[in-house]
Amino acid sequence: MQKISIIFNLFLSLGCLAFTFNGSASETKNEWITLGTMAGPIPNAKHSQPANAMLVNGNTYVVDAGDGTAGQLAKVGLDIKNVDAVFLSHLHFDHTGGLPAILSLRWQTSARNELVVYGPPGTQQTVDGIFEYMTYGTLGHYGVPGQVPAPANTNIKVVEVEDGTQLKLPDFTVDVIRNSHYSWPKGSEEWKKFQALSFKFSLQDYTVVYTGDTGPSSAVEKLSSGVDLLVSEMMDIDHTVNMIKETNPQMPKGKFIGIHKHLSKHHLSPKQVGELAKAANVGSLVITHMAPGLDTQAEIDFYTKQVASEYKGPISVAQDLNRYELKR
């Protein structure tokens, strides 16, 4: 299979930055694949919603599963039957919309391996709801008399994680922290019940932090300290609010103010992404979960320059299906 290497050369006034990603699959490579790079919840014709695949020692792990994840996996040659685990950073629908397809199509294609879904409190209830949705289809199966269909939850396990959880899997360890995507008062019932998480994956000789959705967070900065790769969300908050105004002209002004406040606290601007990467002294930076989606090199350069005003290391603004080798 032909190997394609693409290098972003961003000749900025601050210097030349380059980041290389691989465009072809390899069973022996450890890779991070940005399956979907567009922030939700509005569907986009050019970009799928937030989802990633991490390939380690030939095993497949999905990190967030936005709408379209199953199809995006197929585009990079990965079979949903071979997914070993799904990690959910939080339970907003643009990060979970693809999970029903993964679970139901695995059932329909008789997947035999166990799939573990890791996620914040509420993940078990979410997955149970997917099983409920699958009930009628599983009972009818293929409509052949005498068939005894397997239960919807066959070979599916849920493990709820939260701030401070540490996991040890055969291929890596995982550290879990609560980030600032939610702003419930600390100690409140909502604070206990709803958590948005960031993950640190420590492979044998490589480390990756996936921020998930987050605003500025000292906990995320600490988690990211010295990692080889930071995969961070990013949002142009002013542009996003203006887009909402254009599509919702009748919305009261106070509503827009509230939306702007929410986005500013719960997401990262380009400059804030650079500040995070700089403060954590990460080896390289991949930016995903963009709002708006970036389609031209001019748009990519515009936002990269803002990030690079703070962080001087290698930067890649990811597109759907980009592949990054996890190797020093």
UniProtKB/Swiss-Prot annotation:
Residues 1-25 form the signal peptide. Pfam families: Lactamase_B_2. It is an enzyme of class 3 (hydrolase). The keyword Hydrolase applies. It catalyses: an aryl sulfate + H2O = a phenol + sulfate + H(+). GO terms for molecular function: 3'-tRNA processing endoribonuclease activity; arylsulfatase activity. GO terms for cellular component: periplasmic space. Keywords: Hydrolase, Periplasm, Signal. It is found in: Periplasm. Its EC number is 3.1.6.1. InterPro entries: AtsA-like_MBL-fold, Metallo-B-lactamas, RibonucZ/Hydroxyglut_hydro. SMART domains: Lactamase_B. Its main location: periplasm. PANTHER family: ZINC PHOSPHODIESTERASE ELAC PROTEIN 1. May function as a glycosulphohydrolase involved with desulfation of sulfated polysaccharides. Belongs to the AtsA family. This is Arylsulfatase. The gene is atsA.
